[in-house]
Amino acid sequence: MNAGRRQRAIFVEQFYFPEGWGGAELPRDITMYLARQGYDVEVICGADLYAPLEGDPGPDPRAAGVCIRRVPRLLGGDIHSLKLLRQLWFYMGLVPRLLCVRAADVYVAQTNPPLTVPIVAAVARLRRRPFVLIAMDVYPDVIVAHGVLAAESVVNRVLEATFRWAYRSARCVVSLGPVMSGRLVAKGVASDRIREVSNWATGATGVVRGPANRLREEWHLGTDFVLLYSGNLGIGHEFETLLQGFMAARRIAMGILLVIVGKGSRLEETRQRVQQLGLGSAVRFADLVPAERLPESMGVADLAVATLREGFEGLIVPSKVPGYLARGIPVLYVGPRSDIDHLIERYDCGYALRNGDVAGVTAAILDACGDRERLLARGRAGQAGYESELRRELGLARYETVIGEALESLRGKA
């Protein structure tokens, strides 16, 4: 950044510090990094927490110079109840905060909640400033894939036109991988405006294994082989194939456990399915842990799991996978062919199976249990790939480049 006037960046994301959800920790990393690079950074966010944490929430962005403006909380209780009303309230609070503060040199938004995208795009257009979109999801396609909207409905056509305009108006759109980039091009985003920046691991990236890991005792894991699912259990994640494959594997090798650490809209549904399948004694559920205990929660894993529902490929990319790779944990991915397949194939760091392939999932689990040396080698390969191409420092530098490119476009118009 030049030594003249500090460039002003406004970020919009509903969930921000202090927050346990990985999707909110990433913008915290980005905004703190930019503030330390000399940018004048302001974040407009909500007061609700998607995944509240007990204990230390990690570094406070305000200590790095980030200004935080919050839309006050409307409702208490479960964040997943009355979700649309909560989002509407956030939009109503967002608009005056965008219009009444000093104009930014660049506006940046993630895709949460969805209508943030066209709102921030419109304000950036009104202010004649560049707009940078971080596409954690692709809308309204995610809503259609979930079955909430019919593709041919009038509402979806209106939303499609609105989001298509917003995506195309962005000076830069950050994509999480090549499959998502293809979705964005299909939406009309020019390929030369797309920048691929993978998510990175949040929290402490070490692992604590063996008897030193207190969670093995707290969660009653003993010396069993552990599959770990860590993170959000949302609308885009599929669990039936995983649970069926896990159940079949346990019929052959009893010393296997599944640990699910996280929250999300499908958590209760997953709990119920575990009970229906008679897997209650083999599956452990736990809340998200504070950042300082991530080395322990990740350290229980012999094999880490990511899933994706059919139709969600390229619409979302599970951010838990870079977290697994950073810690040297091999990955079992169950879902349609997606950006996760690209990572697993590139680094030879695990298994990629399709939804419905119960036999394949069973075989992968048994293979992982039966050849620990090969499994450890895959974990090391994934970690080496992460350090070489995906680590936090590289991602932050790429985001700074994206912001710089957007600002160059502004200077070009001057």
Residue ranges and their predicted role:
Residues M1-A64, A249, R411-A414:
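N-terminal subdomain of nucleotide-sugar transferases
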Residues V261-G262, L267-P295:
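Nucleotide-activated donor-binding/catalytic signature segment of Leloir-type glycosyltransferases, i.e.
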